[in-house]
Every structure is written in structure tokens, then in C-alpha cells.
A protein has these predicted regions:
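Transmembrane signal-anchor helices characteristic of membrane glycosylation enzymes that use polyprenol
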Residues: 3-19, 34-43, 47, 63-89
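Aromatic- and kink-enriched transmembrane "portal" helix at the membrane-lumen/periplasm boundary
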Residues: 21-27, 111-114, 127, 131, ...
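Hydrophobic core segments of transmembrane alpha-helices in multi-pass, intramembrane catalytic enzymes
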Residues: 38-42, 95-96, 113, 138, ...
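Transmembrane and membrane-interface helices of multi-pass
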Residues: 72-74, 152, 157-178
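Extracytoplasmic catalytic/substrate-binding loops of multi-pass membrane glycan-assembly enzymes
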Residues: 84-96, 104-119, 124-128
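Specific aromatic-rich, kink-prone transmembrane helix
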Residues: 101, 144-147, 190-209
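Transmembrane-helix motifs of polytopic, lipid-linked glycan transferases
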Residues: 132-157
């Protein structure tokens, strides 16, 4: 109940902060749809944060590893974002951003891109907010990769591996093209990381012997 109340309060606060970026008509159906989606995401974020804190306090090994691997990569991305603030924008990105101010979708760039922009901007109501949210998500994904690799190695290998070796997971994600792509709020960035995360999850489930059904 407390988590839901916090999410509702957060959603209510956005009614006062949206003016920093948006110029929408609250009487349109789009307003209610996006606020409902924001409420769901806010609840998920609050619940996730509470759960993470509980796991860290309980000494959960995977949670601690995830935080330990996420923060260094996030720090690198935030330094780069600070240098290129508010991100690396192209004409297509700006077209989506322009329509997002009035909660309109850019059909040419797919409505999911517009949805990601609008919801990100409700969390952080400035153009750079889209890139900031993107950086947080991507850093969390890379942290999950490293933590999962360490977890799998510990369970599947007979000889222990020093934790420092798992820093090698960072290498492909520290290449300049990848770091620069992370600062570009384009649909290919969102779709690429979504696909990569899904593929990694499937591989991890396979290596863990997780079954999707009883067959």
C-alpha cells in the first residue's frame, strides 16, 4: 500500500513538473493513457527500489554484484553525458521530441519511440532526460550481464574465478562507438539494447537449466 501511495504521489507531482517541458491538453485521451502508464512505471520503480534495498540488507549476493557492476559503468556514461549534454541528437530524434511535447506520436519513427520519449520526459522533464533515463537503463543491463556471468561461473565451474576477471564483460561496451551510441536517443538504441538484453536472458536461462514449461 505504501509503495502504491508513493507512486500515486509521484504521478500527482508530475502534474506540476510537466510544464517544464510539455505543452499538452490534459483533456485529451493521450494524457490519461500516458499518466496511467507513468503510474504503472512509477510503482514498478518504487517497488523495485524497495526490493533492491531489502535484498542488499539481507546480503543477497546477486543484488550486491549487480550494484557493484552497474555503478562503475554508469559513472563512465554519466561523465560522457555531461560532456555531450543533452546528448547526441539527430533530426529524427528532434522530430520525435517536438511531437512529444504535445503527447503526439511520430508514426514514422514508430509510436513506441514516442512513448519511450514521453514517459522518460515525465520522469525527467528536459530533453536530456530522455538520454539520462536511457543511460540508467543501459548501465543496469550491463551490470546485469556482469553479475549474471559471475553467478553462472560460480555455479558451473569447479575452480573459482577471481571477480576482477568479470570486468572483461565491460570491454565491448566501452568501445567508443557503443559509448557514443548510448548518448543518442534514437529508436535503434532502445531496440538494440532491448534485443541484446532479451537474448542474454534466454542464454542465461538455458545455462541455468531454467524451463519455460513443464515439457
Amino acid at each position: 500500500a505504501a509503495e502504491l501511495a508513493a507512486a500515486v504521489l509521484w504521478c500527482a507531482l508530475t502534474l506540476g513538473t510537466d510544464w517544464l517541458f510539455f505543452r499538452y491538453d490534459w483533456r485529451t485521451p493521450a494524457f490519461f493513457v500516458y499518466k496511467a502508464l507513468f503510474l504503472v512505471l512509477a510503482f514498478g520503480l518504487v517497488h523495485g527500489a524497495v526490493t533492491l534495498v531489502q535484498k542488499l540488507r539481507a546480503g543477497d549476493k546477486f543484488a550486491r554484484r549487480w550494484v557493484a557492476w552497474t555503478l562503475p559503468y554508469l559513472a563512465v556514461n554519466l561523465v560522457i553525458l555531461l560532456i555531450v549534454w543533452p546528448g547526441i541528437w539527430g533530426n529524427d530524434d528532434l522530430a520525435v521530441l517536438y511531437l512529444a511535447r504535445t503527447l503526439q506520436p511520430n508514426s514514422w519513427q514508430h509510436f513506441l519511440t514516442s512513448g519511450a520519449f514521453i514517459l522518460s520526459l515525465m520522469f525527467v522533464p528536459m530533453p536530456g532526460g530522455v538520454v539520462l533515463v536511457q543511460n540508467l537503463l543501459i548501465s543496469g543491463i550491463v551490470g546485469c550481464f556482469a553479475a549474471t556471468a559471475q553467478d553462472l561461473a560460480e555455479k558451473r565451474l569447479t575452480r573459482p574465478v577471481r571477480p576482477a576477471w568479470f570486468a572483461l564483460v565491460y570491454l565491448p561496451f566501452l568501445l567508443p562507438p557503443v559509448l557514443m551510441h548510448t548518448q543518442q536517443p534514437f529508436r535503434t538504441t532502445w531496440s538494440t539494447w532491448t534485443e541484446l538484453n532479451m537474448e542474454f536472458m534466454l542464454v542465461a536461462m538455458y545455462l541455468r537449466g531454467t524451463k519455460l514449461n513443464n515439457k
